[in-house]
């Protein structure tokens, strides 16, 4: 849903959704346990107005998407199931399908697995209100009482040529895939 905001430069952000349990101690996160993953579209607005990052992410209802297929994570390491998965995104415009993001191996992200977990734990417990970032400990105080875990969107792909030059328009169809590259080829996904 574009909410008639096409002029604000809307872009698909193909990501992996990690559905995680949090372990808390004294209102701090001491561990994150990724349990499941899925394809996720963190559909974002690209207005560069100096506001908080959250205003570019949370700009309207029905602007995020998660696949109905949720896959269990056996272990969140290089040896786990996620290492086999790639992420791809496409836009169908006027009947033609275009690559939107570059197809990437999930394990190729600069921060993933243990390094990502450690970074997230540190940021969740210490991030202060600074520039485009918001203080996160205020949310943890509520989450520690009311939430077992959280969905974390990780690893947006780089944009393919079409994605770099074209923002989402009303009527576009968006496709985001997280697929097992040991079982499917890029062509399988593109032609799905």
Annotated model-derived regions:
Residues 168-192:
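Conserved glycine-rich phosphate/nucleotide-binding loop
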Residues 1-144, 166, 188-192:
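Glycine-enriched loop-and-adjacent helix/strand subsegments that border the catalytic/binding cleft
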Residues 16-20, 148-154, 170-178:
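Short tryptophan-centered beta-strand motifs in secreted/extracellular beta-sheet-rich domains
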């Amino acid at each position: 849903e574009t909410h008639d905001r096409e002029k604000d430069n809307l872009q698909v952000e193909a990501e992996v959704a990690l559905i995680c349990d949090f372990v808390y101690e004294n209102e701090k996160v001491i561990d994150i346990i990724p349990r499941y993953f899925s394809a996720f579209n963190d559909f974002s607005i690209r207005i560069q107005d100096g506001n908080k990052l959250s205003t570019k992410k949370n700009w309207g209802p029905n602007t995020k998407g998660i696949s109905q297929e949720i896959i269990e994570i056996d272990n969140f390491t290089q040896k786990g199931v996620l290492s086999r998965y790639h992420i791809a995104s496409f836009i169908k415009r006027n009947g033609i399908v275009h690559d939107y993001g570059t197809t990437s191996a999930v394990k190729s992200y600069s921060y993933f697995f243990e390094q990502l977990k450690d970074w997230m734990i540190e940021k969740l417990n210490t991030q202060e209100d600074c520039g485009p970032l918001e203080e996160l400990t205020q949310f943890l105080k509520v989450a520690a009482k009311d939430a077992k875990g959280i969905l974390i969107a990780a690893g947006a792909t780089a944009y393919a040529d079409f994605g770099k030059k074209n923002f989402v328009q009303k009527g576009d169809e968006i496709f985001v895939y997280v697929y097992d590259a040991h079982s499917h080829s890029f062509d399988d996904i593109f032609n799905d």
